[in-house]
Amino acid sequence: MASLSPALYHGLDHLGAIAPGYQADVLLLPDLVSFVPDVVLSAGAPVEEIPHVQVPEWVKRTMRLDLVTSDGFRVPWRGGQARVIGLIPGEIVTASLVDELGLEDGYAVADPARDLAKVAVLERHLGTGRIGLGFVRGFGIQRGAFGATLSHDAHNVVVVGVDDDAMVLVVERLRELGGGIVVADEDDVRAELPLPVAGLLSDRPLGEVLDASRGINGAAQALGVTFPAPFQMLAFLALSVIPSLKITDRGLLDVDRCELVPLTLDEFVELQPSRPATPVSATHA
């Protein structure tokens, strides 16, 4: 059913089953543990050798992102009510919440005691330097930060944290890797899953990817993250076609109204929904 159900759903009536009239895409396995096939059939023809995919070098150079400092994640604030992205367990839709933000030295800050984390989206394809900033509730993160380049649909960098310096470390490590998923705490990268192919795919064997996946999930839990499948949720925070409140590199988006909205709900506070990064080096091509 794992192969038949999606084939039926997408109307691919010739795929998904081993039966007369179906395309013979078949793996013959010696057991259900190792999953190393003895025979591979593609459209009925035996495959003697699985060809190695040659990835063009330009596909591995998609992080057109300047270095940022913690200043790039500062949110000027005078107090008042703010829009907050609210996570819903088991859903990729988000709620549009209203809450008071913590205030330090004229800047809005994360408040892990109230499960309020900062979220940032950094444009990474064109080198524009745009950063959209906001706040999110529901991950449960108590320290550090985590982020990824797997972020539907634009696949910009998205990072969540309660420590601006840790957020900077996550972004810098993602830039060095050429994309992926990174978890950091204080001044240390705790776990990472490199995705160097367009920042979306791994070029490593499945076993290595599985080990790295377990590592990033364990590291996220060590930061206090309680939301189930946090990296899957992270990948949908910037999906600007799914209700209700999302974050993009241009700022917060009210999907229901289909318009960018400021973080603040108070008219007397002037705050841009997004602003350029603070560059300290040339664009990384």
Q: Each PLM stretch: what is its role?
A:
Residues A2-A285:
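Active-site microenvironment of metallo-dependent hydrolases
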